[in-house]
């Protein structure tokens, strides 16, 4: 589902460049991006050989919290492909062997 109007306030959406997502629908009234409705996503825990975990602060999402790499799957992508793409987009790292440790629906 692709939004034309904000589901919260009804304002017509504009196209705005948002972080590493590129241009996307954005509610200038609510000050938030509206992602296409797609039910599957990934959350990736990225750790190095010392077991140090990468955390992100994405100000366009929240200025108060850190988060793990995450993102919506694109049509036709596997969870592993999504994890590789999102880690590349958000951390600038290349991962070669992503491992699925669990799923939840």
PLM regions and their residue ranges:
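Conserved Nudix-box catalytic region and its N-terminal flanking loop in Nudix hydrolases
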Residues: 47-89
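Active-site segment of metal-dependent pyrophosphate-handling enzymes
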Residues: 72, 92-105
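Acidic, metal-coordinating catalytic segment for phosphate/diphosphate chemistry
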Residues: 1-44
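Short, well-ordered turn and helix-capping elements at secondary-structure junctions
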Residues: 17, 31, 70-72, 104
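Short, flexible coil/turn micro-motifs enriched in small/turn-prone residues
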Residues: 5, 26, 65-66, 71, ...
């Amino acid at each position: 589902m692709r939004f034309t109007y904000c589901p919260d306030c009804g304002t017509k959406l504009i196209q705005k460049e948002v972080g590493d997502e590129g241009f996307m629908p954005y509610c200038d009234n609510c000050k938030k991006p509206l992602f296409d409705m797609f039910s599957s996503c990934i959350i990736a825990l990225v750790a190095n050989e010392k077991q140090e975990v990468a955390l992100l602060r994405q100000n366009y999402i929240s200025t108060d919290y850190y988060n793990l790499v995450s993102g919506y799957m694109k049509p036709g992508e596997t969870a592993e492909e999504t994890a590789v793409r999102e880690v590349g987009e958000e951390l600038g790292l290349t991962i070669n062997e992503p491992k699925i440790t669990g799923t939840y629906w």
